[in-house]
């Protein structure tokens, strides 16, 4: 552990100047890593003097989401208030919320995707998104936020392990004796080991329980490497250096890892760029000027608990506020001293009132002070705890003039009696106290400028509210309130997605972005698409643009053998059997639909349907157990698409022969069973001979190995044909999905599918059980009505863990409120005229429902993506004209994107 540098005198010419090293203004002695039970917990070790130590733990916190349901508010507020009451005397909790317009993390993620993608077209789209992200950063729209909590554990080494005054004296005597007999170094080592063990059990574990269990916050203890990197980024923009000195405490004991003998604070000052420069109005560090603002007067109060918790969030979430930090430190005040002070104020007020009465006057201020003093004492006696709260606002700007303007605007956001003023004497001192490596409490020295609050008031000054950032990776939206990037990841983890929105809500653009990201990470995507009468659809031009990675099939002109099994040769044998069973289950449902039909609303004999299902199940078992059938499948896959063996692949026509009591090995057959078998044969022969059925019963004419498969369902004459063609497309999609470890199955605008019980049950089963096959389901619809009427609605809605709702029709508000249980005050915003996509700014608006957490967000598409997927008639015409003018499709899309931007 490094000692203080000390002041030095430097003589320049004839003049001598005394300097105080920056290292001595901060008290970081070493970094600590505590490794127990498979966990790595980091901490800063601060030292003041020779025997005073403070250990500071850091937690990364999700925070309290800025959109809460009414029933959540009271419980969350009570949890925060209860946690504040349990802060240990002598310790402090620091809450650090930062909002900066940066994009380095997202750019790195997209850059990694760019490097792993081979397709020129996909690379073009990824680069377009990188450009859009950089544009949003420069405009101050994209503002990632972080929320960190710092908790202290203060210890006097001379009395560590002592619980009362006598034990403390004995510990000090023992220390003196060991120094006398030469055992002090060993004792000192054991003492530090004991201090750090106590810090873990009596400090870290208590704080973690307080934050997560008592206050209900989602926290993660930061590691030593993360804490060092965070400290490094306060002063530098370069690659972080190795930790100079690290104390490691684990089950084997205490050891020190040293990579440099330099003071860790000296290592932080990597260059002149890193060294802070102080002024009476600002601190200059990392090329930015930092202004400091503090509270001079407390807020007058809040209308309700929700507004109280949102008090600071409503300031930092303003669109014009960026590159800003809020640092709040809470420490427990001495309750007895506060009571005495309140009693003194009350006595002074009573005396002032008596004096004014003697002079035949009324002292209104004395009456107010008396009332407030009595109310404060009542609250304390009823269980409130007095707390010292220090709050500082740090604004970062590139020039002093911009900083002056930003500080004036920031001050104007606080309404009287709250008074926020810019620090004009020693901002460097407060800035240092905001760092996690200084000993002094925030705003406690050189003058105690902290405000005294009761535990019921303090939550209004805690910056715990922010927009939850969602997943670590995935496609990205920007929260409407605060500009926080919110990501949805259905690529690296299993998640089903629902997209709801009326026509012109921007669904096509968002769907295109979802699919682009999936293709970039290597996931195969299968889409069931419903084209317009002219044959165009959401994904028709998109598939043409991605020519080598995509295949677009018109299911009415292609043959799709429903009995073609998925090619599972690349999967483990155990997984092959499981997925083959899944496909046979699908075949059973498909055949049942072909035989029974069962359009919703039509009456069916349940007993007869069960009998048909049983017979079909036995027939399928016999069919796939036949060695000759297996050999034909093997030869077909060996020969490949279009070969003679491929044309001999088993089809529906071959299966009909297995629907007999001889094949089923039935010794005797009842009348009902005989009738069911005849019904099965009749219906299946009908499908084999029909126009639609011929496409199902012939060998497939396409190979579904493209990464993006789009099946267009069009030219359907009636609902029954539509159902069977949908089953055909579903079978091809399922084969493609089952042949991959993970895949996406996208059903676009599918109201007709849910009109048929068998098909809706298939989709419901896929939503409920698709996780084991790695299939992520995406459903796109204008409203939830059609899905809700299907028999599988419960399975579907319960497994659509994430839903994105765009602009909806006013008449659809009731559906979302009734079916999806959305609060009307939340979903009502989606029906407003203001929720339509904005041409100015080029974004669409969405409500993200992530497992019941609501976030209003904006989707900012890149202009090339807009040029490719926009599907209103004017945009489609402009796209076709661009392709006609420019044969190079990338140049054509770039030209169209520029034209759209100009308009």
Regions found by a protein language model. Give the residues of each.
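Short, flexible loop/turn elements at secondary-structure junctions
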Residues: 61-63, 99, 153-157, 397, ...
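Conserved P-loop NTPase motor cores
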Residues: 352-354, 482-485, 490-505, 509-517, ...
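The start of beta-strands in P-loop NTPase/AAA+ ATPase cores
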Residues: 55, 147, 524, 707, ...
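The Walker A/P-loop phosphate-binding site
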Residues: 19-52, 465-503, 510, 689-715
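Switch/coupling segment of Walker-type NTPase motor domains
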Residues: 60, 64-70, 96-123, 137-140, ...
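Extended, folded cores of ATP/NTP-driven motor/assembly subunits in large transport
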Residues: 1-452
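P-loop NTPase motor core of the ASCE superfamily
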Residues: 497, 572-638, 789-903
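P-loop NTPase motor domains
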Residues: 73-88, 333-336, 431-486, 540-546, ...
